[in-house]
């Protein structure tokens, strides 16, 4: 029942911690609880000593102030694309992987947003590409939103050109844009998983001579944000 006693909220956070919830998850839950109280006309002191002291205690027990991974910046991006181009693998696979990385970076997409794209979500226009994201992590109401990718000068690192080539070579006309290959290197109808995207990024980082342990599948998105902030 509302309003909740800060001690009860603190106990709830302890319970989540016992289920191996990360510190970032605990903080998000606390913010959400505070927002719900506000919407219902109640006040919850999320800075109450019983809550803050418990959070600090959980952080000490876990011993994990989570280390953030490095963003993939423009220079890293070019090294990744060059590493893909040098691989002795089927050209069609190179087209797919190049498009995944370039689209992920230039659009600041999450991995799950990349793999959820369908052919029907793409609208190639004179200025570039409009992408309809039907659902996203930040889209609380499931209304969807659009992202636009403009044309750039250098075609080798140009996401729209790369994606167009992938669509042409793969002959995809409906359904998932990014798909798995079978063991015989045939393109299937099955959607690629976001875990596979993370593995691909790690693979090409290693091939580019970059220490992959400092990066994650989120590095494409964070690299986009960092590059945008620095530009």
Regions found by a protein language model. Name each.
Residues 1-231:
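Extended, non-catalytic subsegments within catalytic or DNA/protein-binding/adaptor domains
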């Amino acid at each position: 029942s509302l309003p909740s006693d800060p001690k009860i909220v603190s106990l709830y956070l302890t319970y989540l911690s016992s289920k191996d919830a990360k510190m970032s998850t605990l903080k998000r839950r606390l913010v959400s609880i505070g927002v719900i109280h506000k919407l219902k006309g109640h006040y919850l002191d999320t800075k109450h000593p019983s809550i803050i002291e418990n959070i600090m205690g959980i952080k000490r027990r876990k011993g994990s102030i989570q280390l953030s991974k490095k963003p993939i910046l423009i220079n890293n991006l070019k090294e990744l694309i060059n590493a893909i181009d040098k691989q002795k693998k089927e050209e069609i696979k190179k087209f797919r992987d190049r498009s995944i990385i370039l689209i992920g970076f230039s659009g600041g997409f999450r991995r799950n947003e990349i793999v959820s794209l369908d052919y029907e979500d793409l609208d190639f226009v004179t200025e570039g590409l409009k992408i309809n994201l039907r659902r996203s992590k930040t889209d609380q109401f499931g209304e969807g939103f659009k992202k636009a990718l403009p044309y750039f000068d250098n075609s080798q690192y140009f996401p729209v050109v790369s994606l167009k080539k992938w669509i042409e070579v793969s002959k995809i006309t409906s359904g998932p844009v990014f798909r798995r290959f079978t063991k015989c290197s045939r393109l299937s109808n099955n959607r690629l998983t976001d875990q596979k995207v993370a593995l691909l990024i790690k693979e090409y980082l290693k091939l580019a001579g970059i220490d992959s342990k400092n990066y994650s599948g989120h590095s494409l998105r964070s690299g986009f944000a960092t590059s945008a902030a620095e530009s």
